[in-house]
Every structure is written in structure tokens, then in C-alpha cells.
From Swiss-Prot:
Region of interest: Disordered: 55-94
Gene: NPPA
Pfam families, per the entry: ANP
Single GO cellular component term: extracellular space
Organism lineage string: Eukaryota, Metazoa, Chordata, Craniata, Vertebrata
Family (UniProt): Belongs to the natriuretic peptide family.
Signal peptide: 1-24
InterPro entries according to UniProt: Natr_peptide (IPR000663), Natr_peptide_CS (IPR030480), Natriuretic_peptide (IPR050787), Natriuretic_peptide_brain (IPR002408)
Biased composition (Acidic residues): 71-80
Cellular localisation: Secreted
Chief location bin: secreted
Alphabetic keyword roster: Disulfide bond, Hormone, Secreted, Signal, Vasoactive
The species this protein was found in: Gallus gallus (Chicken)
Molecular function terms from GO: hormone activity; hormone receptor binding
Protein name in the entry: Natriuretic peptides A
Annotated disulfide bonds: C118-C134
Length: 140
């Protein structure tokens, strides 16, 4: 093909691409009826939530949490895992150096980041995500 023919084919292809409706954006795919129905459903859910909030505000008896004695025993879960966890008193202030919080932070941090001392946390995190770095080959 010559230059003029390739230019005209390219131009026609570009024109066809521009004229097709965009399928990547979901807004173009929604019809007004479907959009209206979804907005009405959202409005109904919001009205239900506001009615529930107003009912809770008008009846203070519904807001009070039940104590352990008021909860029926069939609704409570007496598993061994809950018994093994230490119970904290509600009036106990939690400090940064509390051993319970230290254990929770230790569980939260991945083992690689806890035991790492190679380059620092940021580099170790990048190394663990990419498989490169000093901790990339070690398996936990």
C-alpha cells in the first residue's frame, strides 16, 4: 500500500474506534431506567436506616447493651480459644508498654519483618514483596 492508502485506512480505523460506545466506563452502559431503579433502592435503604436510628433514639431501652447475665447461654460461645485469651478489665488503661499489646503487635507484624535486621523495615518490605533482598530466599 502506498502512504495515502495506509493513512486513509488508519483514519477510518480511528474513526470507527471513536464512534463505538465506550464499554470501559460503566456509566455509559446503564440505561436511565436501571439507574433510576438503583437510585430508588438506595433511597429506600437510607430511609430504612434513618427510621431505625430514629427508633433507637426514641427508645433508650433498645440502646442499652445486655450484660453477661442477661444474655441467654445458648447465644454465648464458650470455646477454649476464648478462655485461653486473657481478659482485660474495661477500666484498665492500656499503655504502649502493656505486654498484652506487645503480643498483639507481634502477631500483627509478619515474621519476616519482626526478625529482620538487614537493611531496615522499608527495604525489607520491598524485598519481601519482590522476592529480592536479603530475606527474599529465606522461607518462614
Amino acid at each position: 500500500m502506498d502512504t495515502r492508502g495506509s493513512f486513509s485506512c488508519g483514519f477510518l480505523l480511528l474513526l470507527l474506534i471513536q464512534l463505538q460506545p465506550s464499554r470501559a466506563n460503566p456509566i455509559y452502559n446503564l440505561s436511565p431506567a436501571k439507574e433510576l431503579a438503583s437510585m430508588e433502592a438506595l433511597l429506600e435503604r437510607l430511609e430504612d436506616k434513618f427510621a431505625l436510628i430514629e427508633a433507637l433514639e426514641s427508645n433508650p431501652d433498645l440502646q442499652e447493651p445486655q450484660t453477661q447475665e442477661e444474655i441467654p447461654p445458648e447465644l454465648t460461645d464458650d470455646s477454649d480459644e476464648q478462655k485461653a485469651e486473657p481478659k482485660l478489665a474495661s477500666n484498665t488503661p492500656l499503655s504502649y508498654r502493656n505486654p498484652f499489646l506487645k503480643r498483639l503487635r507481634g502477631v500483627q507484624m509478619p515474621r519476616m519483618m519482626r526478625d529482620s535486621g538487614c537493611f531496615g523495615r522499608r527495604i525489607d518490605r520491598i524485598g519481601s514483596l519482590s522476592g529480592m533482598g536479603c530475606n527474599g530466599s529465606r522461607k518462614n
